[in-house]
Amino acid sequence: MALLAVRMLVLGLCVGGQAAAAGEGQSTPATCSPLCRCDEDGGADCSGRGLTSVPTGLSAFTYYLDISMNNITELPANVFRNLPYLEELRLAGNDLAFIHPEALSGLHQLKVLMLQNNQLKTVPSAALKNLNALQSLRLDANHITSVPEDSFEGLQQLRHLWLDDNSLTEVPISPLQHQSNLQALTLALNRITHIPDNAFANLSSLVVLHLHNNRIQEIGKNCFNGLDNLETLDLNFNNLKIFPEAIQMLPKLKELGFHSNNIASIPEGAFCRNSLLRTIHLFDNPLSFVGTTAFQNLSDLHSLMLRGASMMQDFPSLTGTINLESLTLTGTKIRSIPADLCEDLTVLRTVDLSYNDIEDLPSFQGCVRLQDINLQHNQIKQIDRGTFQGMTSLRVLDLSRNQIKFIHRDAFLSLSALTNLDLSLNSLASVPTAGLSALNQLKLTGNMELRNGLMSKTLPKLRSITVPYAYQCCAFVAYDSAVNPAEDDERRNAFGGEEDMERIPMVMHCSPLPGAFKPCEHLLGSWMIRLTVWFICLVALLFNCLVLAATFSPRTSSLSPSRFLVALLASANLLTGVYVAALTLLDTVTWGSFAEYGVWWETGAGCQVVGFLAVFSSEWAVLLLALAAVERCLAVRALMGKAGALRSRGERRERRRRFAIAALLLGLVSVAAACLSLYHGSAMGSPLCLPFSEGSSPGLGFTVALVLMNTLAYLLSAVVYTRLYCRLGRAQLADPEQAGSVRHIAWLIFTNCIFFCPVAAFSFAPLLAGTSNAVGGPEMAKSVTLIFFPLSACLNPVLYVCFSPSFRYDWLHLRGRGRTGGCGRLVAKTVTKGTVAGGSPVSDDGEGLSSDCGMYTKLHGDSRGMCEHCDAALHIRTSSSSGSSSSSACRHLVKSHSCPALMGNVPQCLSSEGYWPDTGTLSAQSEYGDEGDSFVSDSSEQVQACGRACFCQSRGLPLVHYSYNIPRMTD
């Protein structure tokens, strides 16, 4: 007190002197070093200035000096001799490695000394001896390995001592034996492995003891002897294997932590002598046993946290722990909760029982103050009516990641204060909303059985909701955009007028949001897209059925490999048309309210069947087109003499069989791809039932694989046809039949590739950041998918019907314009030989010229049938382009007789030697008709003669015969 009075007197004199000087027009500035910032109260801040020594020129009345975060490496003797009134000295964050024994001499008023974050290797005991007023000493974050016995001699006023974050290997027992006034001791973050008995025997005033983050494996039973006033004990993050029974010698202990150790069991009555405990942290220990009575009768316990006791099976008894407010028991194998839990814990506010094996819930009716319940990741299967009855204070309820299948419709009836409800990742088929008038946030993600929508009007205060399906957001988005005016007035009145209501956020957040692939009203979107899809559907169904009917008609000739592939391609395209028809029908049935049926459609068998058909048909069509390209290449090479023409009927059949097997194998590949789309669920999650949808999904890899396979198929077709065109010369392509077939397949490949590119681009879009936004977003992706995906199935049969002479011949037979018979078969074979995918007739294997003279002889008796077959050939001639040619057989029949019906009983036309009987010339052996034998070179008189002959024959008039060479019909 005397020193304080002297100091106040000196300060008063200084102030009076300064005032007198000011009265005379002069000023006396306060003494301060130019390297520091000083204040009027005697504080000097010299931190972070890069100083290498203690600054000079400071006022003698400085009581606070901060020279931390500099580069001072040592303190010389008497460096602070001019600062007798210094009370707080901060030297942290320097590189101090040496402190002279006399460096701190003269600092008799020093109370706080901070030496942390330096390079000290031992406690500077000599320099600390004369600091009799020191109350707080920080030596943490150094490299201290030892503490001399006389380190703290003379520091009788010391209250707080920090020795943490050093390299101590043992508790400094001797240096601490005289610190009876010490209240807080920190020895954390060292290398201490053992605490012996009576280690803190003389620290009777100690209140806080931190020993965390050491390597303590063993604690003596009497190590805490003498700590009669200890309230906080921290033993976290050590290697303890046995429960520290020494804590029973701490009668005033209030906060205990020994989490993150290796303690395996907590004995019965473990805390029976620690009745004042308020908080216990026991988590992250491999507990296999917890005594039932371990936590009984802890009347002051407010928080109990036990986490990670993976072997714990029984719920601990909490009898007598009447003031518990927070209970955390997670990561155990507890299967049930005591029915009388709320009878003992009436003031409980927070319960966390997550990550256990709880199957049944008792009634929480007695826990009237409970505000937060966390029961996620358990085995709960149902919520009964009385489980949460009477819990009017409950605000947060987490029941996620359970197996809940049923919730009673009145289970939430009394939860008038509930604002957050998490029911995600369960198996709920319905969610009751009665009583949830105050709910702000609702999570229902992962309840895939929840297909029905929620009524937004039953949740008036809901602001955030997550649902399993985007369609269920349609009700909330629409509700938010069109609020009922009456309800709007009620809200405005409740919040006290428009100004107050404007401050309240009224935005509804619903996830996942509906969009182009999750429409709320119409599946097909705009009318332009809808009309286009309808047109594609009708054309695909009509023309593919027409191609199949004409190709497989019993009136037509036998199928060549090319026509067989045409039929299979039409079948695949027809299935695609069926897929589009299903979408158009669904759009019509769910007109304006697709959200009500979207979930049922996506998750039902109908979408799976339609998706299977779509993937199978599209993949098979792509692969068949590649096979058709290969077949055309082989056929043309054979005709050009590259591989030799097939002569025998057996070889022709073998060739047809090989292509049929190849088509079947490709069909099996397509079936496998369609099945994989169902297995991976890539066709799910979109009402289009296709593996092409917006955003990334688990099936994105499968989608990419499909696109790559289709790309390879188109690339193969393009390479095959490019090589074919390069090898064929202008003279060889001059044959109109050959050129027509090759050109037609080329057009098919070109158009199908063009239609495939947009679909493939949008399939890869999710892999490229920002692509969907750049090209128009999901709306554009959906439009492209709806139009370009089935467009090839629409155009392929149209090309075949409009540009294939083979189809015209089949169509005439389908209409009954032709009859079966030798010349009929001859005309059919010659017209359709080598037809592929709507190509012009090109002889692929020579089967078109397989009729012999015997066949003619049999047909000569039926002059009317021969005339009708010739008439069919003439119709083909007149309906074909000028560049195409008709059957060479009927061509020569017309030359010979003007009409085959006029031949009468002409004898066998061919001799055994292969010469024509009328001329004796060698019969033709080539499989190609010469240009002189085409209908283009025939005179119109011959054509008219055939017509006149047919007219005369029908009326029994005389006939006129002409004699021309008839070519030999080869096998």
Swiss-Prot record:
Hey, which stretches end up on the Extracellular side?
Answer: 22-531, 585-608, 680-699, 766-782
For side Cytoplasmic, which residue ranges? 553-563, 630-658, 721-744, 804-971
Recorded GO CC terms: extracellular matrix; extracellular space; plasma membrane
Check the record and name the InterPro entries matching this protein: GPCR_Rhodpsn, GPCR_Rhodpsn_7TM, Gphrmn_rcpt_fam, Leu-rich_rpt, Leu-rich_rpt_typical-subtyp, LRR_dom_sf
Matching SUPFAM superfamilies: Family A G protein-coupled receptor-like, L domain-like
Which top-level group of life is the source organism from? Answer: Eukaryota
Where mainly located? membrane
Q: List the disulfide bonds.
A: C32-C38, C36-C46, C342-C367, C473-C510, C607-C689
Which residues belong to any copy of the LRRNT domain?
27-60
Residues annotated as transmembrane: 532-552, 564-584, 609-629, 659-679, 700-720, 745-765, 783-803
**What family is this protein classified in?**
Belongs to the G-protein coupled receptor 1 family.
SMART domains tied to this protein: LRR_BAC, LRR_TYP
Q: How does it sit in the membrane?
A: Multi-pass membrane protein
Say what happens when this gene is deleted: Morpholino knockdown results in disorganization of the olfactory bulbs with a significant reduction of GnRH neuronal development compared with uninjected embryos.
Matching entries from Pfam families are given as: 7tm_1, LRR_8
Q: Which organism is it from?
A: Danio rerio (Zebrafish)
Q: What is this protein's function per UniProt?
A: Receptor for R-spondins that potentiates the canonical Wnt signaling pathway and is involved in the formation of various organs. Upon binding to R-spondins (RSPO1, RSPO2, RSPO3 or RSPO4), associates with phosphorylated LRP6 and frizzled receptors that are activated by extracellular Wnt receptors, triggering the canonical Wnt signaling pathway to increase expression of target genes. In contrast to classical G-protein coupled receptors, does not activate heterotrimeric G-proteins to transduce the signal.
Q: What is this protein called?
A: Leucine-rich repeat-containing G-protein coupled receptor 4
Q: Which GO terms describe its molecular function?
A: protein-hormone receptor activity; transmembrane signaling receptor activity
According to the record, the signal peptide region is 1-21
Instruction: Give the UniProt subcellular location, in the record's own words.
Output: Cell membrane
